[in-house]
A protein has these predicted regions:
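N-terminal active-site segment of His-dependent metallophosphoesterases
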Residues: 1-60
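Active-site-proximal beta-strand elements of phosphoester/diester hydrolases
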Residues: 7-20, 106-116, 148-152
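Active-site neighborhood of phospho(di)ester-bond hydrolases with catalytic His/Asp-centered motifs
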Residues: 12-14, 42-48, 72-78, 148-152, ...
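Solvent-exposed loop/turn segments at secondary-structure junctions
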Residues: 16-19, 49-52, 78-82, 115-118, ...
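Extended active-site neighborhood of metal-dependent phosphoesterases/phosphodiesterases
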Residues: 55-144, 164-173
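Short acidic, glycine-rich surface-loop motifs adjacent to enzyme active sites
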Residues: 140-157
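Long, structured stretches of catalytic cores involved in phosphate-ester chemistry, encompassing
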Residues: 156-180
Length: 180
């Protein structure tokens, strides 16, 4: 018989809401020390890195996270989108993208932006991101790989096109949608 191990160790951070000098900044520095000494292979940050999502705050968090000794994968939350395309452009300029995909031996990790595009609006995944999700999963989900999908919002409660998202994901072996 097969002796496949599906174990993977990683750290997940979310809603850290760092503003220069606030308590969350201190807590993040402590978390980084812990992560650097634990057996996590990588770190995922699933949104709300900052309070206001200003360029200054985003650069500050990026600088702090530069102390991590492990790869980090980041998606924005509603505090980074600040409910505008220009804020999202700043996020992409600083972090390189608002989505990620990578594989380990047995998993495909995929993170997608589902930020609102109107102040206080529901979360929404853009059509082109749903298409990207479909293409990435179709090409990567081979040999029994399981999908770990990361997004900022609880899917059914706060995502206006959650059914479109589920329609893509349900074709694959999923572990979870959202940690709440």
């Amino acid at each position: 018989g097969s002796n496949l191990s599906y174990g993977v160790n990683f750290s997940l951070l979310s809603d850290i809401h760092v503003t220069p000098g606030n308590e969350n900044e201190t807590q993040l520095l402590k978390a980084i020390e812990e992560i650097n000494t634990n057996d996590s292979e990588f770190v995922i940050l699933s949104g709300d890195l900052t309070n206001e999502g200003s360029d200054q705050q985003l650069y500050n968090v990026k600088k702090i996270l530069g102390n991590l000794d492990k790869p980090i994968y980041v998606i924005p939350g509603n505090h980074e989108d600040t409910w505008s395309q220009s804020a999202l452009k700043s996020f992409n300029d600083i972090w390189g993208n608002d989505r990620f995909v990578f594989e380990t031996d047995n998993y495909v990790f995929i993170g997608i932006n589902c930020g609102p595009y109107m102040k206080m609006g529901d979360g929404h995944i853009k059509h082109e991101d749903l298409r990207w999700l479909e293409l990435e999963l179709a090409s990567r989900c081979t040999d029994g790989k399981r999908v770990i999908s990361i997004n900022h919002y609880p899917i059914k409660d706060d995502l206006d096109n959650w059914q479109d998202y589920i329609n893509v994901l349900q074709k694959y072996l999923l572990l979870f949608y959202h940690i709440k």
